[in-house]
Amino acid sequence: MIDTKLIVAIVVGVWALLFVVRMSIQKKRESKATDYRASNADKALLHLYGKKFSIDGRDLSLFETVSGENLEKIVALPEGSHRIAGVYQSTEVSALGQNINLESEMVEFDAELEKGHSYSVAMYAYSPEERREYYKGDVPRDVLSVPLTLVKGSENVKAYIIVYQES
């Protein structure tokens, strides 16, 4: 019969090995994202959270991108107005403590981007004003807010696509 100590040692060994591999992959991803930001400092950096993105009518896969944290895609764009389309995803916690996965339909809008700045585009369950109030004003500048509703034409907004200028 296999000894309990041997089983525990094997489990701990496998866990330690997988931990080291995961940390190595994370470090490479962070290094790649940092290098990408540095080499594109003269452009507008757009951080996208979702899927099926296109920019100016071109699929995101045609752009040079890097992956960041939390499945974000980072793309460098020239300064100016850009048409951004995509399906945005977010996770919110309900009053009962359950995770709720939110997903928009295809949303398309124009955003004015300035070179040398970083922008995040994501879906939130609250408005920019509510976030500003909650964090007592310590939030990035919101460039654009697109309210989403469950029923077309409804005034009861349930989520927002917000473009924040991070830097």
Task: Name each model-derived stretch.
Residues 1-76, 87-167:
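Short loop/turn and low-complexity linker motifs enriched in small/turn-promoting residues
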Residues 80-84:
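A short tyrosine-centered beta-strand micro-motif
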